[in-house]
Amino acid sequence: MPSARMGQEGEMGLGYGWIRPYIHYNLRVQPFRFHEVSGAYRIFKGVPDPVLSPYGYGDYTDKGANLKLALFSPEESRYQLPGLAIGLEDFIGTSSFQAYYGVVTQILPRYGLEVSIGYGKKRIHRWFGGISWMPFWQQQNMYLQSLAFVGEYDAIPYQNSNLEKHPKGHYQKTPWNVGVKYRLCNRVDLSLSWIKGNALAFSLSSFYPFGTTKGFLPKLHDPLP
């Protein structure tokens, strides 16, 4: 589920996710501190493409674009106030996964907590929420600082075939998802989750702050004339 957190200005990220019954690829760009644009490419595992599969091109796929705008970030108040964001999902493309939402996110640095609550329309149906807890973020052990335990209330009505397009994606035992996340070398995010009460999910993503980087190679002084 979405949160109101944003990346750094000029940041770009790539991601892969195995979230049964889909495989996800995504690209994320943060052109401004308050503006995030992302694209998603989904593979419907086990669902043949009616046009291309007979020619050996694999399963059915879907592409879409997402937009998120931060109206207020928690960093602006030094985490005294929550952040607020609105978003559109899959607003370009087939719109098979289209959703609209608003979300607030409160950061509690003292406890290593991030709490989000929001309301959505279409695929994200009504109230949703999420929590992330980093119990070791203030400790000296660099290997544990970025470990986070996460949970969320998933507001997607998977039983609705108009909103969940994959024929094997309708079954859900519980809307509560739990997982663990880990940031490696401050550039790579790994996550392992138990979703819908019946399936494991895995994701891997990497990001780089092109807007603030000093470059991959050192800048040499121009030679004197």
Residue locations for each model-derived region?
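A short, polar/proline- and glycine-enriched secondary-structure boundary/capping micro-motif
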Residues: 49-50, 126-129, 201-204
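Short gly/pro-enriched beta-turn/loop segments at secondary-structure junctions
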Residues: 97-99, 110-114, 122-126, 142-146, ...
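Short glycine-rich, acidic/polar surface loops and turns
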Residues: 130, 177-179
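Internal active-site segments that recognize and position negatively charged phosphoryl groups
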Residues: 88, 98-117, 127, 133-135
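Transmembrane beta-barrel domains of Gram-negative outer membranes and organellar outer membranes
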Residues: 1-93, 100, 108-111, 140-143, ...
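Flexible, glycine-rich linker and terminal segments associated
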Residues: 138-141, 148-150, 158-163, 168, ...
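A mid-sequence, solvent-exposed acidic-amphipathic segment
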Residues: 116-148, 152-154, 158
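Membrane-spanning beta-strands of outer-membrane beta-barrel proteins
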Residues: 20-22, 60-64, 97, 124-126, ...
